[in-house]
């Protein structure tokens, strides 16, 4: 294979002319498209960085809100627990007061029944004494009979 110098020079000249023609008519357009694409890529990267920063800020803000909500929930829980404890204490106190009231009423009722029973016993004692007196007046009572009547009276009274 032989290399013809004139063909090589001619090819180099053609290549240079094609480059000059392409540069003259298309290089600015291609360069503009490339710069436009580079700007778009840079804007997209910038936007992605901004979005990532916003996302980090939202994440921090959401974590703060979550922490605040947890603290608020804890405060509410503690307040409700304290309220429940207070209500429990009030219920227990009211129950104690009611129990004491019932106990007091029962004691008063027992005291009334005791007084009523004592009154009935006294009434029966008086009735028995009257009956004994009537029997004593009906009979001539000697000391032995008198003792027997008193013993019967005591037995009836339950002393």
Swiss-Prot record:
Transmembrane portions of the chain: 7-27
Keyword flag Flavoprotein: no
GO CC terms in record: plasma membrane; proton-transporting ATP synthase complex
GO molecular function annotation: proton-transporting ATP synthase activity, rotational mechanism; proton-transporting ATPase activity, rotational mechanism
Family matches, as InterPro entries: ATP_synth_B-like_membr_sf, ATP_synth_b/b'su_bac/chlpt, ATP_synth_F0_bsu_bac, ATP_synthase_B_chain
Subcellular location field: Cell membrane
Family recorded in the similarity comment: Belongs to the ATPase B chain family.
Name of the featured protein: ATP synthase subunit b
UniProt organism field: Clostridium beijerinckii (strain ATCC 51743 / NCIMB 8052)
Encoding gene (name): atpF
């Amino acid at each position: 294979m032989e290399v013809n110098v004139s063909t090589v020079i001619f090819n180099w000249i053609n290549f240079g002319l094609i480059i000059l023609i392409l540069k003259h008519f298309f290089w600015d357009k291609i360069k503009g498209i490339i710069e436009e694409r580079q700007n778009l890529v840079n804007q997209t990267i910038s936007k992605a960085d901004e979005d990532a920063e916003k996302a980090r800020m939202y994440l921090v803000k959401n974590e703060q809100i979550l922490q605040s909500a947890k603290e608020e929930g804890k405060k509410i829980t503690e307040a409700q627990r304290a309220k429940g404890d207070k209500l429990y204490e009030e219920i227990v106190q009211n129950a104690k007061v009611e129990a004491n009231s019932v106990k007091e009423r029962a004691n008063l009722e027992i005291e009334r029944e005791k007084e009523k029973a004592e009154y009935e016993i006294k009434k029966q004692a008086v009735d028995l004494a009257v009956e004994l007196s009537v029997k004593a007046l009906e009979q001539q009572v000697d000391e032995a009979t008198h003792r027997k009547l008193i013993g019967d009276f005591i037995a009836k009274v339950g002393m």
